[in-house]
């Protein structure tokens, strides 16, 4: 006689049932999407990513913002030999990125606060990404009449390797880096989400006047991020008074899963915002 299914089998059965069932208002349960706390960004995770931003199928992530077939035909550009000509276009670009979004607390909280912006959670862990996607699907069903959460989505991505594949120059108005892996050991610092190289990539995808939001409970990592952004000529740290007046800062402090954990443990939260400056005229 077969014994009861193990935890792994239960998780697989639960996710399969959600995939095969009708649209559900019920939020997914985290216990069925467990995964390690961190993933190695230098490993080959067999990720799917576009060759360029023009080849990204955004319409499947934001169907409510996709142009009609007639509108797409009217604005169709000459074919360049890529698959981009067959993709349905969006009425507007994604402009807010929650990098390392975890279980999607911030992504979901920002959606109703920024109703005119398309918000994208980006997460490297497969099962965690699946959880956020199911969470957003359920919220869309719950808010079908109001239309909330149509502006939020999540993809599995390694932004340390492929961020320019998703976003064109000056596309983003906000990037959130919330409670990233501190990588305490010196030999692991190269895996931190902020570095000299990555600061240059952030400068490329963030438009002038845009903001990068950072928060961590590790003071050493906070100082590291401040040092690297201050060293980049196109970023300037936002003054504390302006920082505290930004409603996104309070959301960032309170709505992420890691932020809630730090609050429960009475831990510190170190916040720093950096504004993208105008490019020099030359």
Swiss-Prot record:
Q: Which domain of life is it from?
A: Eukaryota
Q: What does this protein do?
A: Catalyzes the formation of N(7)-methylguanine at position 46 (m7G46) in tRNA.
Keyword annotations from UniProtKB, A to Z = Methyltransferase, Nucleus, RNA-binding, S-adenosyl-L-methionine, Transferase, tRNA processing, tRNA-binding
Could you name the Gene Ontology cellular component terms for this entry? Answer: nucleus; tRNA methyltransferase complex
Pfam families reported in the protein's UniProt record: Methyltransf_4
Part of which pathway?
Answer: tRNA modification; N(7)-methylguanine-tRNA biosynthesis
Please state what the protein is called. Answer: tRNA (guanine-N(7)-)-methyltransferase
Question: Which gene holds the coding sequence for this protein?
Answer: trm8
Q: What EC number(s) does the entry state?
A: 2.1.1.33
Annotated family: Belongs to the class I-like SAM-binding methyltransferase superfamily. TrmB family.
Which intervals of the chain are annotated as region Disordered?
A: 1-36
Q: What is its main location?
A: nucleus
């Amino acid at each position: 006689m077969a014994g009861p299914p193990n935890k792994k089998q239960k998780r697989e059965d639960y996710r399969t049932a959600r995939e095969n069932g009708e649209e559900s208002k019920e939020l997914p349960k985290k216990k069925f999407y467990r995964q390690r706390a961190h993933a190695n960004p230098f490993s080959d995770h067999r990720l799917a990513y576009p060759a360029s931003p023009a080849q990204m199928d955004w319409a499947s992530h934001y169907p409510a913002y996709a142009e009609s077939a007639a509108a797409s035909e009217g604005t169709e550009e000459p074919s360049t030999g890529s698959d981009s000509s067959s993709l349905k276009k969006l009425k507007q670009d994604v402009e807010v990125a929650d990098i390392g979004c975890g279980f999607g607390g911030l992504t979901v909280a920002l959606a109703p606060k920024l109703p005119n912006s398309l918000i994208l959670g980006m997460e490297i862990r497969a099962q965690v990404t699946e959880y956020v996607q199911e969470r957003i699907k359920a919220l869309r069903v719950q808010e079908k009449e109001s239309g909330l959460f149509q502006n939020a989505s999540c993809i599995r991505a390694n932004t340390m390797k492929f961020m320019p594949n998703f976003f064109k120059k000056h596309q983003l108005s906000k990037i959130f880096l919330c409670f990233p892996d501190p990588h305490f050991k010196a030999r692991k610092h190269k895996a931190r989400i902020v570095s000299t190289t990555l600061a240059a990539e952030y400068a490329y995808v963030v438009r002038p006047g845009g903001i990068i939001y950072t928060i961590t409970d590790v003071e050493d990592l906070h100082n590291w991020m401040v040092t690297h952004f201050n060293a980049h000529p196109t970023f300037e740290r936002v003054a504390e008074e302006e920082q505290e007046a930004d409603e996104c800062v309070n959301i960032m402090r309170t709505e992420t899963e890691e932020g809630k954990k730090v609050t429960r443990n009475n831990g510190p939260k170190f916040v720093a915002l950096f504004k993208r400056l105008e490019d020099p005229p030359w």
